[in-house]
Design a protein with these regions (language model features):
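Single conserved hydrophobic/aromatic residue that forms the stacking wall/gate
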Residues: 1-15
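Short, motif-level signal for alpha-helix interfacial/capping segments enriched in acidic residues
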Residues: 4, 65, 114, 302-308
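Transmembrane and membrane-interface helices of multi-pass
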Residues: 19-21, 28-276
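Soluble catalytic regions of membrane-associated enzymes that act on cell-envelope
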Residues: 232-350
Length: 350
């Protein structure tokens, strides 16, 4: 061949090699951008969860014991524990979008509807999470415990519950905080989705077996990390609420628990076989048998096995008073360092 022709062929081969390398780099960069898109949303969601926990920490009128009151390191540990639990919920939500973008990257398919679906998915599930987190603030303030499956008992009294929530002015701030968080997150997710879609779509190119292998390996590692985040720990059992307990203070121990996580786990626990309502025999048959054994007909409106007791002598009118204090903590007693004098009679009996 003529030297000039040979040189032109060599230049053509070199250009093709450079183009192929650039295409491979673009494909890897596309998947990297997809991962960056998911990571940013993940971090933004964790910041919102941190905000809800901070509001709960500052809004609860709680008196720390003297040994914890000025121990900021111990108080900060609750927020670190909270990040751990928040990440579990965020990984639950992250898993499906991560798998979808992994599959679309392997197929070199980047469609607008994919990012639109992922945006709606994030907005829907994080909105639900923020509603639960916002509801946890007044719930914790009233019951001194993280929101759990007991709230389902109120669903049968929808009108009464709504009236109680909307009629209490102290609940307005958590409601406002939840709505603002949903709006801010929705706007952020939509903007990020639009930005990364155009950024990834502008780099569209062909895909080679080597590219697929690299994307498959990177995606498998990321999905493995996400599943590990859902599990929460390397021990035999996955993360549990008890992992948040690290001190003797009941408030700090519960502060680290994510409300969504606690509601989810308590609901699952209620539906376990060993916790379900036992149907050993028909209820009416059991009542009839007990009435026959006890020789009672019961008192309507009180109990089917109740009986009326009539005193033969003159009653002495003595009373037995029982005091039940729901979610009462020993730290609120003067004996354990409280200066509020909330329970003077209980303190005198201790």
């Amino acid at each position: 061949l003529h030297p000039r022709v040979r040189r032109q062929r060599q230049m053509c081969i070199r250009d093709r090699s450079v183009t192929a390398c650039k295409n491979q780099a673009k494909l890897i960069q596309q998947f990297t951008l997809s991962l960056l898109y998911l990571l940013i949303i993940h971090i933004v969601a964790l910041l919102f969860f941190f905000l809800f926990r901070l509001v709960l920490f500052t809004s609860i009128d709680y008196q720390f014991p003297p040994d914890i009151q000025n121990n900021f390191l111990m108080q900060a540990t609750a927020f670190i524990k909270g990040l751990w639990f928040d990440n579990v919920i965020a990984c639950y939500i992250l898993l499906l979008p991560l798998v979808i973008l992994w599959i679309t990257a392997l197929c070199n398919y980047h469609s607008k509807w994919v990012f639109r679906f992922i945006s709606i998915f994030f907005i829907l599930f994080y909105s639900l999470s923020f509603i639960i987190s916002a509801a946890n603030i007044p719930y914790f303030s009233y019951f001194f415990k993280t929101i759990n499956s007991s709230i389902y008992n109120w669903f049968g009294y929808g009108a009464t519950t709504a009236g109680m929530v909307l009629g209490e002015t102290s609940f307005y701030f958590p409601i406002f905080l939840g709505l603002i968080s949903i709006l801010l997150l929705s706007g952020s997710v939509l903007r990020l989705s639009s930005y990364f879609y155009h950024l990834i779509n502008s780099k569209s190119t062909s895909i080679s077996p080597i590219n697929r292998l690299c994307i498959f390996a990177a995606g498998a590692v990321c999905i493995g990390l996400c599943l590990f985040g859902i599990r929460g720990r390397m021990g035999y059992n996955p993360i549990r609420v008890s992992q948040a307990y690290y001190c003797t203070d009941p408030f700090l121990n519960q502060l680290g628990v994510n409300p969504v996580f606690n509601l989810l786990t308590s609901t699952l626990d209620d539906n376990r076989k060993e916790n379900r309502y036992l149907h050993l025999m028909p209820e009416q048959e059991a009542i009839t048998n007990m009435q026959s054994i006890l020789q009672r007909k019961g008192i309507e409106g009180i109990s089917p096995i109740a009986r009326e007791v009539k005193c033969a002598a003159v009653p002495t009118q003595k009373n037995v008073v029982l005091i039940f204090m729901e979610s009462m903590s020993a730290n609120l007693m003067e004996h354990f360092g409280s200066t509020e004098k909330l329970t003077p009679f209980l303190d005198s009996l201790y």
